[in-house]
């Protein structure tokens, strides 16, 4: 199976050595470590990475480079034109159009749902980009591609809507939290050892 990792699970659950270790395990189990180009962009220190996560983020990017050079990473291009970009754009239009509605955003600012800094820098527009990119890829082949994310799937400023659940229902995507994914990998390792 191809396991797409989301930004939150990479930053919160992985370090470089764990990433490389897992990729090595995948080699033995015929699973694939995968990311989207948008996830890799989200890992770059800057507006989207918290200051406290900047060093870890740099380290993860170095680990990703090792995986790329070792041919242990599959990267999906969502930013370029094609079916993944089309899927991504549809998801963003359908579920995140409210982030381009200035009246909606001003109300969120007044309620304290968006910080003044987010409003000023317009970083709120990019909320959940990584999750959307993973869904855009997974919906093309939901039996072979799963998403590993500890994000709950709630849409920014519309927490009653769960994006992961929407696409589980409509496109049969598979989403695993870190612990669930780790158990699956351990089962795969044990079954490979027995074979």
Where are these predicted regions, by residue range?
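Acidic beta-strand-to-loop metal/phosphate-binding motif
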Residues: 146-151
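Active-site-proximal, substrate-binding regions of enzyme catalytic domains
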Residues: 2-142, 153-195
């Amino acid at each position: 199976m191809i396991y797409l990792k989301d930004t939150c699970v990479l930053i919160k659950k992985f370090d470089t050595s764990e990433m490389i270790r897992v990729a090595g395990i995948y080699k033995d189990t015929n699973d694939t470590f995968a990311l989207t180009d948008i996830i890799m962009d989200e890992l770059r220190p800057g507006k989207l990475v918290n200051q406290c996560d900047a060093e870890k983020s740099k380290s993860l990017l170095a680990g990703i480079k090792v995986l790329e050079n070792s041919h242990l990473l599959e990267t999906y291009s969502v930013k370029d034109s094609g079916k993944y970009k089309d899927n991504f754009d549809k998801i963003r239009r359908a579920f995140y159009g409210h982030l381009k509605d200035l009246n909606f955003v001003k109300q969120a600012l007044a309620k304290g749902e968006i910080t003044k800094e987010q409003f000023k820098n317009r970083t709120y527009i990019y909320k959940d980009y990584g999750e959307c990119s993973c869904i855009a890829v997974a919906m093309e082949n939901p039996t072979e591609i799963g998403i590993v994310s500890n994000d709950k799937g709630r849409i920014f400023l519309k927490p009653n809507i769960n994006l992961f659940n929407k696409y589980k229902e409509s496109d049969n995507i598979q989403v695993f939290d870190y612990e669930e994914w780790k158990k699956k990998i351990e089962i795969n390792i044990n079954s490979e050892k027995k074979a």
